[in-house]
Amino acid sequence: MAKTACTVPITQIILDEEIYPRNNVSPKRVSMLAENMRDGFEIDPIEVQIHPEYDDKYRILDGAHRWHAYKEIGATEIPVHIITLDGLDPLLYAAKKAIGPLQLTEDEARTTARRAYENNSRLTSFEIGQAIGRSRQAVDAYIADLRATFQMDLDLKILRMNGLHIPQERMANRFGVLQQTISIHLQKMPELAKLVNTDLSKGFTVPQVAEKHGWPEPMVWSLALEGKDDLERFKALNWGLRTWDLWNWNDCDRRFGDDWPGRIPAQMIAHILYYFSDQNDLVFDPMAGGGVVADTCFAFNRKCWSFDMADRPDTRPEIEPCFWDITDLKWPIKGKTKPDLIIFDPPYFKKQSNNYDPDGISGMSKANYLKFLKSFFALAHSNAKKSTQMVFINADWRDFQNTPAKNETRVNSILINDYLWILNQSGWQETHIFQAPLSSERFKANVVSAMQKKKIIGVTSRYVIILKKK
């Protein structure tokens, strides 16, 4: 922990209620401090830290009464110590400082303990107690309900990752706990599944059971469909099975995946799984987005390892964080296990680019986008088994905005032959190409009318390309 002494404008200092352990500031104490300041008494500098959300602001760790007193006497600049906490919890640091002159009240201690645990469930009762001046037993009582809720939530997250056969070591790393802790939680899994299966056996529907137990619906489907073959699973989900190479659906099945830019239909993923994988195969999803692939793998009894640059450990623990750096492209997992099927559904160049992270590949130039894909295909090839198949989903990109069809050029466009060329250059050979058109609903009547008058051709083509290693 570092400390830097300096003087800063008082307007740059904020009292952040999120890390202030007291219920209120004492006007009497502020007035006393202000009087001492006027009389020339030396006052200890206020302790602050750089505000996590505003680079030009500081928030108070210790000295809220002194700060108010400085404001009362009209000070414009005040002496401070800027503290670098190096991972220490700011609320607990502030609480430990606050109990120096006066112990926290019972209400303040309880509130601070609960807020600290909600912010960081890895904190022990001993650590919290040391900061707020209370015994471990007292803290246990303060946070008992929060701890129980956290344990239930952790059980469900572990069950979710375990259902997709993510190794315990990676689960432990995901949640910041010991692998032994994961093993202990896994012992509860049969009982959790039994409760859900009991309700299913009583005739409750999958949505009803999911809502009752707080499970994601795809996880309930994984139990409801246990022991069934893929065709039976299609029937249970009320999905027809297409036996031709045109895969078009009017809408995504909202039971699978989150509301996400560029969301793909779960029905499409189910068809890919049916034709190009078997139950218990390992599916690798390098750009998971809203989690459609993982959810569909639950319903079709496939193992699934998913990765994405958007890290959502609370809502999507099974999607592990991964940023594909074009300057240093690395496979996100180590070990001998290699996937049976890779489903690669990246952003379709500039489509939806306004809804994606600007640091992602949709923010790249055409040349860099294709360069990234070629590097990824080569990396996937070197991390695949001889029998591994890859599915590449993408769409034509044409710069057709305000451009009549006969005036279009290939300068900015990316078409299927561009993708096929770099796939072949990277050691992959296509075996099937499915048409999976994008919805044309985004072309509203007035837009269509304008396009017709200007002789503009829009893009709805999307391809599902199935590949094997050469």
Give the positions of each predicted feature.
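Short, charged/polar connector segments at secondary-structure boundaries
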Residues: 1-83, 252
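Helix-turn-helix/winged-helix DNA-binding modules
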Residues: 5, 62, 119-121, 163, ...
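Short, basic/glycine-rich phosphate-binding loops at helix/coil junctions
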Residues: 7-18, 91-94, 246-252, 351-358
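Amphipathic, charge-rich alpha-helical segments that serve as recognition/docking helices
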Residues: 17-34, 68-164, 189
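Short, cationic motifs built from Arg/Lys/His that form the positively charged side of catalytic pockets
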Residues: 21, 65-66, 101, 302, ...
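Exposed loop/turn and edge beta-strand positions of beta-sandwich/beta-sheet ligand-binding modules
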Residues: 54-56, 152, 461
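A generic structural signal for residues located within well-ordered alpha-helices
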Residues: 62-65, 108, 264
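Class I S-adenosyl-L-methionine-dependent methyltransferase catalytic core
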Residues: 158-176, 181-470
